[in-house]
Amino acid sequence: MTARNSASIPTSIRKTSENEVSGDETPAGVGNLSTKTASKTSLTFRQSSSDESTSSYSGNHHNINIQHHPNRPFRTNSSSFSPNDYSISESPSKSKKDGVHVSAVQLDNETDSEVESEVEELERELEAIEDSVYPEVRAAVNPTDDVNLPVNTWRTWVLTTIFVIVFAAVNQFFSLRYPALSISFIVAQLILFPLGKLLNLLPNWKIGYGRFSFYLNSSPFNVKEHAAITIAVSLTSSTAYATNILSAQTSFYKQNLSWGYKILIVLTSQMLGYGFAGLTRRWIVYPAAMIWPQTLVSTVLFRTLHGNSGNDIGVLKNNRISANGWTISRYRFFAYVMIGSFVFYWFPGFIFKGLSYFTVLCWIWPKNRVVNQLFGYNSGLGILPLTFDWQQVVYNSNPLASPWWVICNTFGSVVLIFWIVVPILYYKGVWFSNYLPMLSSSTFDHTGVSYNSSRVLNSDYSFNHTKYESYSPLYMPMSYSMSTALNFAAVTAIFTHCALYNGKDIWQRLWKESGKDECIHRKLMRNYKEAPQWWYATLFIVVFGLTIFTVRYYDTQCPVWALIVALLIFIVNFIPQGVLEGITNQHVGLNIITELIGGYILPGKPLANLMIKLYGFIPMRQGLEFSRDLKLAQYMKIPPRILFFVQLFATILGGITQVAVQEWMNYHIPGICTTSQSNGFTCPNGRSIYNASLIWGAIGPAKMFSKGKPYYPLIFFFLIGAVAPFITWGLRKRFPKSWIGKLNAPVLFTGPGNIPPATGINYSSWAIVGFIFNYVIRKRAIHWWRKYNYVLAAAMDSGVAVAGVVIFLCVSYPGGKITWWGNTVYTKTYDWKSVPYRSLGPNETFGYTNW
């Protein structure tokens, strides 16, 4: 079947398939990376005129309603119509009779044989047009492409350069501050639209000479340029993890580091995963089942800003397209919601912060320990409370872009593990946890205060066993212990799950890129030259060589063999993790497992533990973000070769910018990274990484997880994770239509992975929003859901992102604040003060007598 571009299709088309994959019935792509082709469609044809009347056509493939202009002559009971006079939108099918019958219209100047031929030609046109079998993708992505839209323009490169430098610099600057500010790439996506349109006013002058010349305004700013620049900014707007390690090394380990080391460690850790992402495209980017749900929000925002795409979703009523009674355009809907989101966020974000931490029961009983531990937000489990802060709702992911079955698995796991099991173990005093806060990501000593790792180290940061015995073992809060256990289970579960559910397709795609079936969006991308595999292989080899040079030439305590172990961690996890995230929006963090392995293979070497964590975790995380953007580029039909160079350029430029900004701050901000820094530049991320490196690298996991040690039982969760997918797979085979058949082991284990520091309040609000929109509305008002759901997600994110930046830069950072009950009530509770269930008296300790 031939893929078609928009120039050859005078209509916009939506199809509803009888055997499409539905998010309410089957977890998208859980069993197969391939897709199935829709067999029957239901269509409506309408003319753009405001004065129209209706006719209908039904047949074994299509049910078609025809709107025609009243000023055109026609005869009823004819056999066909002229397809060039009409555009297409969706309508529910009302007839499935065999054969073809048209109950309306023939133009007076056509013969029966001519219109008969036109019907056959139109049917061939319709059969040639495909769309995704996934309703989420159909609602967000056009199944067409305009190959004539330019991407490799001066606007793309100049705006990419400016936005990458600005976003990388600003986010790096404020990342060293507490509270921090992070400007999301969605802000760039919004600013780029009016700025690009403004550039359309430039004269079309010729700049340069010969082959090095270009025209200043040869074509209007288009959606593909917009998408390419946004993708570049998204890769670099968040702070590189390696810069936090640099903070730990310079400010806490007191190392003098060269510019060369700083640039190399940032770029190698950021780019090592890019090459592997390119080499694995056939598994985690190309398949239709790899939806990458979060990209759909960006896709809809692009479509909404650049035209009226999607406004034809619905049914024709009173000469207007109605989506379950709503006729407002996507653009106006986006504008209204974004403005409302911007205005409302000022309340939970500044005026009445209690709306963000809406733990009313804790406000009523501020000194009741049990109430605060069960229903609190800061150190409690967050049972029942709601939040009116959209940032809290989307803390885990955007619920409007998360499949309902994923939300069910995740929230069910939170309820079972953190709302039932954790309180039982906590109040029984397992591991003396009731002397610690119910929820915290910190480690503690036997007096209930944060563990002071410097008390068990020598001056060279090596472990001193005598000091350790005279001080205290490490104790983890119960929530932290269970989060660690779930992480262990998730790491092994994804391998078993991937083998059972996707193993056959992964093996087939090893030999044939396209697999059993191919998505229409992948087919349309064949209009462009692909970035070849050897480009990505070369990139991986070059960066791998630079990584070896970095750990060998500089003092990192990390031998090459240990580096290779770290790289193997990310390599073997990449495809299973990519499949999981591409389908579910969830991923398994490898930070704990890399620290665990690093602590066992290189005990007593905290700097080496940093390197193992950096190169075992970050290349996979960055590589999967690269893969996500490759999928977004596929949806937006951006030429792969141009995108390849744009992404590399942006990453290198952003990395150097972040290093330069951090270096400037080290020399120009007095007292940086100290707790007494007057402007809050205390380097909280660097301090956290430093403490983690001492705990996992210097003290080591052997003191916690080896046989005979307190947390040894958690190791068995590796086995539990490996076995659990067999159970869920068996249930799916036995009960394919029941909810029990939709249980997904990796999601059950990794879904609650943000606890701590997230709490139940983040998950309960997330689940409620997901239930309303991705279950109730999707089931009862499918046209509304398809037309507005992802627009709503983009508008809410956009309004909050812009409001957050304005509040921080214009009000909070200069020192503005409002002191009243609504901004202080939540801070006067035991929850906010992290009070444990059991308290110690002066000079009292708890815990084991021998460790």
From Swiss-Prot:
Glycosylation sites: N32, N77, N109, N256, N452, N464, N691, N843
Biological processes per GO annotation: glutathione import across plasma membrane; glutathione transmembrane transport; protein transport
Transmembrane segments: 156-176, 179-199, 259-279, 282-302, 333-353, 405-425, 480-500, 531-551, 560-580, 592-612, 642-662, 711-731, 757-777, 791-811
Family according to the record: Belongs to the oligopeptide OPT transporter family.
Post-translational modification Phosphoserine, affected residues: S93
Role this protein plays: High-affinity glutathione transporter which plays a role in scavenging glutathione from the extracellular environment for the maintenance of sulfur homeostasis.
Biased segments, Low complexity type: 33-68
Species assigned in the record: Schizosaccharomyces pombe (strain 972 / ATCC 24843) (Fission yeast)
Membrane topology of this protein: Multi-pass membrane protein
Keywords, sorted A to Z: Cell membrane, Coiled coil, Endoplasmic reticulum, Glycoprotein, Membrane, Peptide transport, Phosphoprotein, Protein transport, Transmembrane, Transmembrane helix, Transport
Record's protein name: Glutathione transporter 1
Annotated localization: Endoplasmic reticulum membrane; Cell membrane
Segments of skewed composition (Polar residues): 1-14, 74-92
Keyword Nucleotidyltransferase: no
Induction / repression: Expression is increased by cadmium ans repressed by cysteine.
Highest rank taxon of the organism: Eukaryota
GO cellular component: endoplasmic reticulum membrane; plasma membrane; plasma membrane of cell tip
Chain spans, region Disordered: 1-116
Main location: endoplasmic reticulum
Pfam name, any one: OPT
GO molecular function: glutathione transmembrane transporter activity; oligopeptide transmembrane transporter activity
Coiled-coil boundaries: 105-134
